[in-house]
């Protein structure tokens, strides 16, 4: 199973994702670690990334998830995944195709749960202002909010408000993962 912890900057993707992975004993990847230097420089200068900037990065993340799946590993990935097209690329490794050609069995679609962390502008802004040493400045939060396409059917997702303790958020996700894993095991028995 693959869990993608998604949301705008400041939503807590890395903290939640790393704690969840540790609690579950799964591998953790932070998508920020895979941005090319050009992307990091662009963002640190306050310039939002465009679709062309993101596509190779998303394809690399897809390859990582495919490799882990082939090895039989479960993965938690912290990744903004702001647009439906970006999430499609994460799942298929190809040019976005949702909804026209959506296929339930596309590469990672049936194995992936998106966890959308969301919160008020006030909470997100405060978190970004408190964060030190990150290439993503507070000034880009508005552009990320404008870009965000919250997940919806047929995507597999849950949405969690981040205005609570991290341990509560992690427990909520863990409960959902347990339910999904039980459903998979039940389906395999049938």
Curated annotation (Swiss-Prot):
It comes from the Eukaryota. One of its GO terms (molecular function) is gluconokinase activity. The keyword Transcription regulation does not apply. Pfam families: SKI (PF01202). Disulfide bonds: none annotated. Keywords: ATP-binding, Kinase, Nucleotide-binding, Transferase. SUPFAM superfamilies: P-loop containing nucleoside triphosphate hydrolases. It catalyses: D-gluconate + ATP = 6-phospho-D-gluconate + ADP + H(+). It is an enzyme of class 2 (transferase). InterPro entries: P-loop_NTPase (IPR027417), Shikimate/glucono_kinase (IPR031322), Therm_gnt_kin (IPR006001). Its EC number is 2.7.1.12. Pathway: Carbohydrate acid metabolism; D-gluconate degradation. The keyword Ligase does not apply. ATP binds at residues 7-14. One of its GO terms (biological process) is carbohydrate metabolic process. Belongs to the gluconokinase GntK/GntV family. This is Probable gluconokinase. The lineage of its organism: Eukaryota, Metazoa, Chordata, Craniata, Vertebrata.
């Amino acid at each position: 199973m693959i869990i993608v912890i998604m949301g705008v900057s400041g939503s807590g993707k890395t903290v939640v994702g790393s704690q969840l992975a540790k609690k579950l004993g799964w591998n953790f990847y932070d998508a920020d670690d895979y941005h090319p230097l050009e992307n990091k420089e662009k963002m640190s200068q306050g310039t939002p990334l465009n679709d062309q900037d993101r596509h190779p990065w998303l394809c690399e993340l897809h390859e990582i998830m495919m490799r882990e799946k082939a090895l039989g590993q479960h993965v938690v990935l912290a990744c903004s995944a702001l647009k439906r097209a970006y999430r499609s690329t994460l799942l298929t490794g190809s040019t976005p195709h949702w909804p026209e050609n959506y296929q339930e069995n596309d590469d990672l679609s049936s194995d992936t749960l998106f966890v959308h962390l969301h919160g008020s502008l006030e909470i997100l802004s405060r978190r970004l202002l408190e964060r030190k040493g990150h290439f993503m400045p507070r000034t880009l939060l508005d552009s990320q909010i404008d870009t965000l396409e919250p997940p919806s059917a047929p995507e597999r997702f849950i949405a969690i408000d981040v205005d609570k303790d991290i341990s509560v958020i992690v427990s909520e996700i863990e409960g959902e993962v347990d339910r999904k894993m039980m459903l998979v095991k039940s389906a395999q028995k049938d």
